[in-house]
């Protein structure tokens, strides 16, 4: 009986020792990889900011209010037409499904 408990205790301590040693090493790797990740992230955000400002400047140079108004008008007319025809289609479909009642 005593040998079994001693064997179990040794195995538990061995597993705990491996866990402690295993947990210690990845933290160092994690610290270096997180700093690398942070550097990459900062670099990406820097490039993103430059690209965003360039595109925004280009958009402001080429912005045409008359074209914008025409696009909005076409969108409003087309959505009104689509909603009208969708209503007609729905009514026809319901009348076909119900039949002559």
UniProtKB/Swiss-Prot annotation:
Top-rank lineage group of the source organism: Eukaryota
The encoding gene: APOC2
InterPro entries in the cross-refs: Apo-CII, ApoC-II_dom_sf
Key word Iron present: no
Summary of the function given for this chain in its UniProt record: Component of chylomicrons, very low-density lipoproteins (VLDL), low-density lipoproteins (LDL), and high-density lipoproteins (HDL) in plasma. Plays an important role in lipoprotein metabolism as an activator of lipoprotein lipase. Both proapolipoprotein C-II and apolipoprotein C-II can activate lipoprotein lipase.
Subcellular location: Secreted
Residue positions assigned to the propeptide: 23-28
Any GO CC annotation of this UniProt entry: low-density lipoprotein particle
Annotated spans, Lipoprotein lipase cofactor: 78-101
One of the GO BP terms on file: positive regulation of phospholipid catabolic process
Name the record gives this protein: Apolipoprotein C-II
Keyword hit for Glycoprotein: yes
Signal peptide, first to last residue: 1-22
Species whose genome carries this gene: Neomonachus schauinslandi (Hawaiian monk seal)
Molecular-function GO terms, alphabetical: phospholipase activator activity; phospholipase binding
